[in-house]
Regions:
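Helix-rich "cap/lid" substructures immediately adjacent to catalytic or cofactor-binding pockets
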Residues: 2-98, 178
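Alpha/beta catalytic cores of group-transfer enzymes, especially the acyltransferase/condensing modules
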Residues: 22-24, 50, 111-186
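Short, electropositive, low-hydrophobicity segments enriched in small/polar residues
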Residues: 24-27, 32, 55, 103, ...
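Conserved short-loop catalytic and cofactor-binding motifs
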Residues: 30-31, 68-71, 107, 140-143, ...
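An amphipathic alpha-helix/helix-turn recognition signal
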Residues: 41, 75, 101-102, 114, ...
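Residues within well-formed alpha-helices
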Residues: 45, 79, 83, 105-106, ...
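A general structural motif at alpha-helix termini
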Residues: 61-62, 101, 123-126
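Gly/Ala-rich beta-loop-alpha elbow adjacent to hydrolase catalytic centers
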Residues: 80, 95, 99-103, 107, ...
Length: 186
């Protein structure tokens, strides 16, 4: 449950909300927040847009079902927006809102750049297109930790063995995500 004590701004820049991308989902996420009216309202809005009970999905889906991009994205987007709405209803206002990958859409909703319904509609199309692309062109990704670009590029060339294997995301110093065919990523 959210602590009802207001948070003090963190230094001169203030508080920043960050919405995560796909991959951070897990069954039961948000369970301790579902009694909050803002959370229920946000999940109800998402359910209306997606055409299924997004709260039930987030709370009760088996990991394999929740990890399907058509399910992970709606659940994560709804939860990210819901948490922000609950905090803001309690006087916690962000100085900035950021998002990583899928979280960029949640950040647009939280910042007021998109209505929640518009953001969820965008997530619906995004998740469907990504699922179609993945089915047509199976691929895999893996994050490499304590990695540098030169060694990752060399590793990709060495391990590709005729398949596709490339550095795809330079997340932060020391973390590089590689992507390619499932066999090459293995």
């Amino acid at each position: 449950m959210l602590d009802e004590t207001p948070l003090a701004p963190l230094g001169p820049a203030g508080l920043v909300f960050m919405a995560s991308g796909q991959g951070s989902q897990k069954p039961g996420m948000g369970a301790d927040l579902m009694d909050l009216p803002e959370v229920r309202e946000t999940f109800a809005c998402a359910s209306d847009v997606f055409g299924f009970d997004v709260a039930d999905l987030a709370l009760n889906a088996e990991p394999e079902k929740l990890n399907d991009t058509r399910n992970a994205q709606p659940a994560l987007a709804a939860l990210s927006v819901a948490v922000a709405r609950a905090l803001m209803a309690r006087g916690v206002e962000p100085a900035a809102v950021l998002g990583f990958s899928l979280g960029q859409i949640s950040a647009l909703a939280v910042s007021g750049m998109l209505a929640d319904e518009e953001a969820f509609a965008l997530v619906k199309v995004r998740s469907e297109l990504m699922a179609e692309a993945a089915a047509a062109h199976p691929g895999a990704m893996s994050a490499l930790l304590k990695a540098d670009e030169e060694n990752v590029r060399a590793l990709c060339e060495e391990c590709a063995e005729g398949d596709v294997l490339v550095p795809a995301n330079f997340n932060c110093p020391g973390q590089i995500v590689v992507a390619g065919t499932p066999a090459a990523v293995e």
